Amino acid sequence: RLEVFRTHGKIYEASASQMFGVPIDLIKKGNPEYALRQKGKVAELALGYQGSTGALINMGALDMGIPEEDLPDIVSRWREANKRIRDLWYAMDNAAVQVITQGGSIGINGLIITREFDYNQGTDCMTITLPSGRKLYYVSPGIGENQWGNPSISYMGMDQKTKRWKRIETYGGKLVENCVQAIARDC
C-alpha cells in the first residue's frame, strides 16, 4: 500500500490488480479490465476495517452495478490480497479478548492493549496505548457471545444514534479503525 502511494497513487487500480490478478497497466479507461477498478474502489472503501458484504452494499456496490452474488467473492479476494491487514484485525480482537478475560498487557505493532483498574475512582477500562503515548479508553469492557457463537467484545459508551450511554459491541477491525484514526490525529 505504501508503495502505491509513493509511486502512482492508483489505490483502486492496485487493489483490483491484486484481487483479480490482472496487471495494473490494463486497468485503464478504454480497456475491458477498467470495470475491475470499480470493484477495487468499493472494496478499498468498505473492507479495510473488517467490513463484509453488508458494508459493500452500504457503500453502494449494488448501485454501482456490482451483482449481489459477486460480493462474497470480492470480500474473499480483498482479504486474501491484504493478509497483513486481515491478520491485524484478528490479532487486535484476540488480544482484546485475552486482556479483558485475563488481565495484563499485550503489544501489537507498536500498540499496547491493557486492562486498567483504578480502585480509587472505581473505573475499569481496557486501554490501547498509541505510539504517541496517548490512550484510547474502553470503559467497563466485557466479553459476550456474538451471533456466530464467538467471543464478542463490548464496552460502555455513547450510542451514536440515540446519544444514550449503553453497552456497545466492537471487534478487531473496529479497534484497528479507532487506532488508525487516532494515530493520524496524533501526527
Name each model feature, range by range.
Residues 1-187:
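Conserved catalytic core of nucleotide polymerization and phosphodiester-bond processing enzymes
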